Every structure is written in C-alpha cells, then in structure tokens.
Amino acid sequence: MADLSLLQEDLPEDADGLDVDDYSSESDVIIIPSALDFVSQDEMLTPLGRLDKYAASENVFNRQMVARSLLDTLREVCDDERDCIAVLERISRLADDSEPTVRAELMEQVPHIALFCQENRPSIPYAFSKYLLPIVVRYLADQNNQVRKTSQAALLALLEQELIERFDVETKVCPVLIDLTAPDSNDDVKTEAVAIMCKMAPMVGKDITERLILPRFCEMCCDCRMFHVRKVCAANFGDICSVVGQQATEEMLLPRFFQLCSDNVWGVRKACAECFMAVSCATCQEIRRTKLSALFINLISDPSRWVRQAAFQSLGPFISTFANPSSSGQCFKDESKSSEDSSAEDKDRMRDNDVVEEEHRRPEDAPSDLSAPHSSARLESLEGCAAKTPGHSAGDVPAPVDSSLLCTLSSESPQEAASNDENGRKPDTNSKSASRPDAGTSSPEATPLDQDMFNSFHFWRTPLPKIDLDKELQQDPEERLSPERTGDVPAAPLPGPPNITMATRKELEEMIENLEPHMDDPDVKAQVDVLSAALRASSLDAHEETGGVEQRSELQDEVCVSELPDCNISHDTCVPLISAAEENAEATPDYVHGGADVSPGDGFSPDEDRRPKVQDVVPQALLDQYLSMTDPSRAQTVDTEIAKHCAYSLPGVALTLGRQNWHCLRETYETLASDMQWKVRRTLAFSIHELAVILGDQLTAADLVPIFNGFLKDLDEVRIGVLKHLHDFLKLLHIDKRREYLYQLQEFLVTDNSRNWRFRAELAEQLILLLELYSPRDVYDYLRPIALNLCADKVSSVRWISYKLVSEMVKKLHTATPPTFGVDLINELVENFGRCPKWSGRQAFVFVCQTVIEDDCLPMDQFAVHLMPHLLTLANDRVPNVRVLLAKTLRQTLLEKEYFLASASCHQEAVEQTIMALQMDRDSDVKYFASIHPSSTKLSEDAMSTASSTY
C-alpha cells in the first residue's frame, strides 16, 4: 500500500514548497524540490485508511491495485481482529465494483486470502465462509466471461486445498451449481457449471457426488438443445464413474453413456471414445464383455474419422481393462506336496489374497518344464467347479471343453454344480485339488473316470454371476460323458458374445445388407468384417443350442482328444493342455500368470504360427480391430500415427492376453518393429523390457531378442530406448545369451551425432547396473575399456558418472577371488590417468580417488597402499586446478575417514606433510582449501568449478 501514492495521485498545483519560482537570490540557482523531500499523505494514513481511499478512487487502476494488495493489508492488521473483519467487509464492497477487471483481480486474490484466513483462524474464525465464499459462488454467474473463468479456477483451487468445509459445499456451492444448470439458465453458464460439477466431483467425494451432483449430471447428459453440454458430460464421464463406483455406474450412468455414444454430434461421440477406458474400469467384467465391447465396436466403425481416431487410440487401454486385477504378476506354488496339502493351500490363498503378492518371482527364474498356469479368476471358481471327489484319479488326461460349457462336470448334479460355481466353494470338504502325479503312474485305489477328461480346471473363462445351463448339461450324465461323444467336444473356446438373441442376429444381417453397396470404402469394409464375425459367432451359439455337441465339433480348427484315460497328449497339439509329464510331482514351482492360462513352460510347437489368432480373454472382435491397426489403409483412413498408438498399448494388451496367447500378437509386434516411422520403433524400444517380463525367458529369447538386436543397430532415437532399460532387459535373459551382448556394448560409444553426450551418460549409468550381471573376468575384459573411455570424455557430465562407474568397478573386482583384476585395474588407472601428460587426465585420477574414498570401494589400508602414493605426488603438479582438487580431496574426504584420524601410521604422516606443502602453495585457492576445513563447502558442491568442461 505504501507505493500507491506514487502511481496515480493528483497533487495540488499550489502545494507548499513546489513553487518553481523559488530560488536563492545570492547564488541565482534555481532549486526544484523533489516529491521525496516531503512526507506523503499516504504515509500518514493507516492501512485501512489507504484501503478506503483508493477503493473509492475513480481511477480503475487504483482500484485494481487495492484488490492486488488486499493480502498485504490483511498481514499488516492481522493482530487486531476488528481490523481484519473491517478489511473483509471492504472486500465484500469491492466485489460489487462495476469494472470487470477489478472483480477478476479480486477473484485471483481470493485463494491466497482464504489460505491466510485458514492459517489465522483463531483471530478471524469463519472469515472465509462468511465473507469470501459468497463472492466466489456469486461470480460463477457473472456476466463477464473473464470474471466467471477466474471464479471457476478459484473455486477448484479452494476445493483442492480443502479450504471449503463440507457443510459449505453442500449448502452453498452445490445448490448454486444446480441452479446454474437449470433448463432456463444461460447456455454458456450452463456449460461451464456442468464442467465445474464434473471437476469438483473427485474432490468432494462419493457421498456428495451421488446425492447432489449425479442426478443433475444424468439430466445434462440428455440435454437435447445444447450439444456443448452433452460434450462436456461425455468428456468427464469417466471421472464421474470412478467417483460414484460400480453400482451407480451400471444402474444410472451406463444408459446415459449409451445415448451419448450414439449422439448425432461427432464431437460427443469422440469424447465418449476418449473416456471409454475409465468407464470400463467402473463396470463389472460381464458388462464390459457383453455390452461395452459391442458399443466400442460401433465407435471404431463410426462414420466420422475423428471418432474412429479417438476410438483406436483408446482401443488398447480398453482391452487392458479385461485383465485380471487380482493377480497381474507371476507367482508360484510348490508342486512337491500332496494334493491334500495343495488343496489346503488353495483354501488359504482364497482367504488371503496377499499370499499371491508375497510370492512374486522373476519370470526368468521359471524352468522350461512348468505346467500350464491358470488365472486367479479360475482359482476362485476352482473350489466349486473343478474339484474331484475322493477316489477319483488325478492322473487322467483332460480333454478340451468349449468355453460355453459350465465349469463343472463332476459327479454332482448340474444344479448343485451351478450353485457351487456361483458361491466359489467346494462341494465336499474332502475333495482334492487337481494335481497330477508323475507321468505313467496312477493311484492303485482310484479308478479313472471319464469325467476327468472334461475337468474344467485346465480351462479358463471369466466367471459370470449367473449362467444358464446349456442343453447338453441338462442331459443324462452317462449320455453326456460317454466315450463315443468325447471326440465331439471342441478344442478351443469360440469367439464372440456368448448369448446373442435372434433379434440381434437379424439386426446384424440387416446392417450388413445396408453396408454391402459401399464396400469400396475401406472403413465400411472393416465394419462389415466385424459385423460378419459377430454374426458368425451368434450362429455358432445358435448351433450350440439346437445341434448339440456333434454339430459344434465341425466348427473347430483342431480337436485334441484323449480316448484312453492313461494316454499322454502329444506336444504337437495346438491347444495348451496339461500333460502328465508337465504335471509331475517334482519340487518345481508352478507359475501362475495373472492374465490367464500359460502354456506349458512357454514351450510352443513349430506349428504355433499357424494357430488361429483366437483366444477367450477379450472379445475376439476387439482383438481383431487392434491387430488391424498395423494395416497401411488405417493410416490413410483413420490416423497417420495409428501404428504408434498400437505400439504404445501393446504391452498392456500382451499382459491382458497372457503369454499363452502371445501367438495372437507376435506378427503384429514384428510388423511394428519394422515400421518405417522411427517413432513407432522408438515406442517399442522403450517398452521391450516390460514385454519381456510378461512373456518370460523362453518367449523373450525366441521372439524379442532378434527385435532387440535390430533396435541396437537403429537410429539413436530408437537406440536410446533400449539403452535406458538395458539392464532391465538383459537381466531377464539366460546367462549365455546375456554374455553375447558384451561384444556389442562398445557400439554404444558411437552415435550419429557426436554432440549427443546424454547418450554416453546413459551408457555409464547402465554399466553401473550391469556390473552385477557379469563375472569379474567379463567386467575386466569388456566393461573396463568402455569405462576408461568414458572417463576421458569431452563432456564433464559424462565424466562425473564415469568416475562413479570406475569406483564401483574397483569395488567389484577387488572383492572378487582372486583380486588380481582389481589390482590390474588400479595400475591401469595410475598409468593412464595418474601419469597422464594432460592435466585433465590427472584431475580425473583425483576425482576417481575421491569417489573411491567416499563410497568405501576399497578398505583404507588397501587404498593407502595402491592409490594414495600416486595421489600425493600430484601435490607438485604444475597445474593449479589439479592441486586445488587434491587439497579438497585430502581435507574434506580423506581426513574424514577413521583410519587416518585414529592411526599414527606412516600414511597419515605422508598426508599431513602433503597438506602442509599445499598450505604454502603459491596459488591462493590451493592454500585456502589446504589450510581450512570449511564445513559448508563440500566437494560435490564446488568441484565442478575446477573441472574442465566442454559444455
């Protein structure tokens, strides 16, 4: 406030002492007094007086300055409660200013004033609620757009900082917003109010959102007059769903979402496509699979290119929502125990889901002969639908069953089986889990039954809350399980939705007929392909209902049947069954992947490439659309960067499908890896280590390593992706495969642009991590030359990281047996750097010694023998920079060690003599650092001042 008088104050013309005619008659010198020679009237006013004076000024700029200085005025009078209240009352009057710029300036200061009031609440209780919040709420409906925007930003800032009480939100904020969204409200105000309601929902919580915001939000989604309102609702739909939860989403929001997805304005449909993943996360798996999938297919086939573009960008994230959220990693269980013990462990795991998280193991530890893993979703239904009764043999070979069949084919009745499947419990407490004995062995007491061929333990499907029994399940058990009928059971689940009505099939046929005349358009052709696939899937379901098992067997690509109970299934089959050899009782871990089943030990047959790209984790139509993103026609008709979006989401899709379905994605991944756009390849390079974790060591070695090798020879923009995660990828490989890359590490020193020093800095960072993966001999033979090369880099930032690399290398080689590699490395450091003809090399030697001391890479007695004599000889170096750094190292690092503080050895005496010599150095900086031990000055803070750098 003190500077307000200097801004726009009109001084009277006849002010005392300002007459320009005053002069000294003796010297004839005109004296022009300055305004600073006199006491300003403002300096005589109190803070409240100055506030009142300029708040009433006719000058708009003065009133703006009053609004801007309100916080300073409050700080001046904060000790007096009455003055604080007086300032707040002036704020209320200033809020009625007719000038929009003054009101906007005032609103910008409200969050700061509110925070001050919160901190000084004892002095001015309820100040914000009584004086400031009404202004914010009132400005939400201001006629001026700038004032409204400022008040909206202020309201969100206040909510984010939790400065508004919950009671005030319910009684003052929400009612105003609801009024602003009334049908007779201004169009612009209504649109902005809806946006505020959506943005504040995550801040106010589920209760207030459901009671006060959700009903009006649903109404706004159906606003038939203003598409801007519907567009705002669609853009924020995912946020509302995540706040209110699954039940409210499915009951109230999903019908509105379906309407918005079919809106006649493409901008609304595009907004729906962009938030599709968030909406999917708030629904159950059944709705996601049966309803949202079909809805998303419509968006992908939308007539508007912008809608299709947004839909394809969201396709990968939407597919990832089909992943099993309870166990997305790998876990193992010991198969050496009896089936009874395994059953007990399954019960414990069902009661405590934390066991899965506590038993994570790296994928590279998985042996090659692991049994086929199963998803946790199937574990939940295992207790009721896959248990065997006592006396049944666990050594029988199961035959594949269709995914439309109910999960249980045990000796219990179909009604009991369905009940147990829903409840997730075992029908018999004495029943055993499905555990296979050694190949070729069987229990002498147990008699193999045909039911074991159809054991659903080996097959995965999403558990549904209510399942209608198929006709074949309601048949007589003996007829259903007769050996003559086993060969008719299909080998793989069929794609497409499981239950499609006749009316739906009729609609699909009509849509295909309407689109056939426009088959020249690639987009229309793609839509017809999708609809045809859905129609075929519905036809398959119709055949299942009417034709029974015999007709469905003709629709399968391959059928894997075991007609005899004690026979083994051939490894050439394309259906991932669990054979007896892979289910032996050895003490090997059984991996369970979080997405779904994993084929045995990741061992895929040579015919795998010819396997149909069919799976049952996600709707097949969605996967087909995702795989089509690499089609060149998509880049022309949808988005030129569609391949980049496909590459970006591929790890999430792979995790969802699981490694047993990698054959569906392999060709797409190879296509992306050879894409002409380097941005696509760069995206894959940055995520290849994550994909390796998902696929496991065998698939990584077979499919990812060749692509990884190609990335190593690509552009620098692509190479940096694999370099940043080089350690993460190599640690997943077998030791022999990992050693092959030792010969290629040297290639990272060569870049397309020599000025790309960050590339070499990242290489040094990765080499530090790679030290743990290789033997001391490999480190000495291959990593040592690279590290010494980086220590002599032209850029100081690269050298700084390299000093750390060399010190860690010294530590590893010194602790190795025998320690000859460490001694040889130290001798090479002395020869190449300690006696280097260039002063920068000798300075680098001091830096390395300092890092070795700080990180305790060598015992002090070993350091004193191998490095310290050569370090002390640099006290006579002709370059002051080297001597300055030596003085810092001796004073601030070496003498800090207990070895030199407690012992009176000859080494300590040599150090003290060197320091005394440096204290008498002719350079003032050397004497300074050698004479004192400044506590506030550390080598890490000022060593760069003495380092030579190109940049």
Curated annotation (Swiss-Prot):
HEAT repeats lie at residues 26-63, 65-81, 82-119, 127-164, 168-206, 208-246, 248-285, 287-324, 506-543, 699-735, 800-838, 862-899. The keyword Glycoprotein does not apply. Pfam families: HEAT (PF02985). Residues 411-421, 430-445 have a biased composition (Polar residues). Regulatory subunit of serine/threonine-protein phosphatase 4. May play a role in regulation of cell division in renal glomeruli. The PPP4C-PPP4R1 PP4 complex may play a role in dephosphorylation and regulation of HDAC3. Plays a role in the inhibition of TNF-induced NF-kappa-B activation by regulating the dephosphorylation of TRAF2. Serine/threonine-protein phosphatase 4 (PP4) occurs in different assemblies of the catalytic and one or more regulatory subunits. Component of the PP4 complex PPP4C-PPP4R1. Interacts with HDAC3. This is Serine/threonine-protein phosphatase 4 regulatory subunit 1. It comes from Mus musculus.
